[in-house]
């Protein structure tokens, strides 16, 4: 099978400790993609496309299961994308940016408030192709992040050229 592995920037608005970003990152890495994670240190839901102006942005390494997972920053989702592009990974030319997997729906007018969508929009402004992914299970069922992560991995398999 001919597949093009991609350099993928991952962020979210639920924070680096959220199950959605961790599940997606693990799946993409298992498949062989180069995945670079920069996410808020805490839940930043509802931050839209906001940026941090009144305090210095700081980032530090985040470990998961005893291994380097990515960087967490004390800013908003759009800050994560900016900092990844212009500082942390300034020498990397990303093929794609994925924001998510978000916990909860982002439908209709929700997009105006969504930090998940805001991070993807920032990537687009920085000339990085982007996707934002949200998951809402009806009737209070448990979120199935594995299903969505598998779907995204297969979706990326199906496209050889994301230009």
Segments (PLM) and residue ranges:
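Short, Asp-centered acidic motifs that coordinate Mg2+ and/or phosphate
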Residues: 96
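A cross-family phosphate/adenosyl-ligand binding-site feature
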Residues: 2-11, 18, 22-87, 91-93
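Glycine-rich, Lys/Arg-enriched anion-binding loops that position phosphate/diphosphate groups
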Residues: 116, 125-163
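Short beta-strand segments
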Residues: 11, 38-40, 99-102, 133-134
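Alpha-helix C-terminal capping segments
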Residues: 84-91, 120-129
